[in-house]
From Swiss-Prot:
Residues 173-194 are annotated as: Disordered. The gene is apgM. It comes from Methanopyrus kandleri (strain AV19 / DSM 6324 / JCM 9639 / NBRC 100938). This is 2,3-bisphosphoglycerate-independent phosphoglycerate mutase. CDD domains: iPGM_like (cd16011). Pathway: Carbohydrate degradation; glycolysis; pyruvate from D-glyceraldehyde 3-phosphate: step 3/5.
Length: 422
């Protein structure tokens, strides 16, 4: 019997983009329904289950805004834009006044005087295929009227930080978001002269980066191998950091984030949480999930709350790969969730399994569909739900609620919240 007043640890397991819709290829099931997930099902069977609107009903969440809500922050109040978060996660300093962008290494062709995007991810190029060399060349050979830093991140992703005064994040994206469309001219979205100046600088960066990348040895070799060259950079998601109350100050708990994706690591760093690193945690499909689980358990030894994220499920959704998504979910269940459960005492820990958003394979992008949530601890209320998926979760005792309330629900179960009233 557990003694009241003994605070529990909290572990939040996030399958990035794991929720979905019915898929004809899977006989009308969602990938979660089609997948063999004994460990996730155990959490549902022995815990409390429900549906979560990551932000609120009808709002399509980004991974960034959704993770902020999971950690107890209202993104409408603290979201700085994706650029600064990606930069922090990639290990790039973002100072007051800097403007940061998330970027893609992409493939473009010259057509009628325009750069037309033919692959937004350059064949999903990654760090092992030369993106550090491409970034190094950009930093050495591109000249701009302001100081800047460009750095490769996970896979086809990168970050650009413009430094100095007279800059603004009030600018549009260069990314057309679709193949077959020309790279967009970045434009100011306000009357601030700093916005017009920033837009001009970003357009200059895109042009000059293309000139140094189009004949780069890395890209010549990719073309020789029949792979799309990473010859253009697509900046988007401009933002500037503002001061945010640290997680430990807001909730009186120490926290850690275990993730491979730069974005998720950046959120942890912005909130002052610890972000342990390990070269086996790549943020790609080849990440070592057992090592990620071990890292999370190690972090749980000396932190009150640990959030662990697996991003490859989301990538399969974006790629429209139903079978691949089932495979990633099963791997997550076996290697991540299973390993975590082997090292956790439910008397001492509150475990939450959820997704940050839905990425239906039929859509290839995030949607506002609610996601399943299971909360497992020794004295959790048990409902009739025995399987962890989007449909079964609707019958759970947690009902349907906003992600903005999730952390307080977990804190209550962990005896880490004060009573309201007498």
């Amino acid at each position: 019997m557990r003694v009241t007043g003994l605070e529990r640890k909290i572990l939040v397991i996030v399958g990035d983009g794991m929720a979905d819709r019915a898929v004809p290829e899977l006989d009308g099931k969602t990938p979660l329904q089609a997948a063999d997930t004994p460990n996730m099902d155990r959490l549902a069977r022995e815990g409390s289950v429900g549906l979560l609107d990551p932000i609120r009903p009808g709002v399509r969440p980004g991974s960034d805004t959704a993770h902020l809500t999971l950690l107890g922050y209202d993104p409408f109040e603290v979201y700085p834009g994706r650029g600064p978060l990606e930069a922090l996660g990639a290990g790039v300093e973002v100072r007051p006044g800097d403007v940061a962008f998330r970027c893609n290494f992409a493939t473009a062709e010259e057509r009628n005087g325009e750069l037309v995007v033919v692959d937004r991810r350059a064949g999903r190029i990654n760090e092992d295929e030369g993106t550090p060399k491409l970034a190094e060349t950009i930093n050495e050979e591109v000249d701009l009227p302001v100081e800047f830093e460009f750095k490769e991140a996970v896979g086809h992703r990168a970050v650009l930080v413009l430094r100095g005064g007279d800059l603004s994040a009030d600018v549009t994206d260069a990314d057309p978001k679709r193949v077959g469309k020309p790279v967009k001219d970045v434009k100011p979205t306000s009357d601030d002269p700093a916005a017009a100046r920033t837009a001009e600088i970003v357009n200059e960066f895109v042009r000059k980066a293309y000139e140094v990348l189009k004949d780069h040895p890395v890209n010549r070799e990719r073309e020789r191998q029949g792979k799309p060259p990473a010859n253009v950079i697509l900046p988007r998601g401009a933002g500037q950091l503002e001061e945010v109350e640290p997680f430990s100050d807001r909730y009186g708990m120490s926290g850690a984030v275990v993730a491979g994706a730069s974005l998720i690591k950046g959120i942890g760093r912005m909130l002052g949480m610890d972000v342990p690193e390990d070269e086996a945690i790549t943020g790609r499909k080849d990440t070592d999930l057992k090592r990620k689980a071990e890292l999370a358990l190690e972090a749980l030894d000396d932190h009150d709350l640990v959030l662990v994220n697996f991003n490859a499920v989301d990538e399969a959704g974006h790629d429209g790969d139903a079978r691949g998504k089932v495979e990633m979910i099963e791997r997550m269940d076996r290697e991540l969730v299973g390993t975590l459960l082997e090292g956790i005492d439910p008397e001492e820990t509150v475990v939450c399994l959820t997704a940050d958003h839905s990425t239906p394979v039929a859509v290839g992008d995030h949607t506002a569909d609610p996601v399943p949530v299971a909360i497992w601890t020794a004295d959790a209320r048990r409902d009739p739900v025995e399987e962890y998926d989007e449909i079964s979760a609707a019958r759970g005792c947690l009902g349907r609620f906003s992600g903005l309330h999730l952390l307080n629900v977990l804190r209550d179960l962990a005896d880490r919240i004060e009573k309201f009233g007498a």
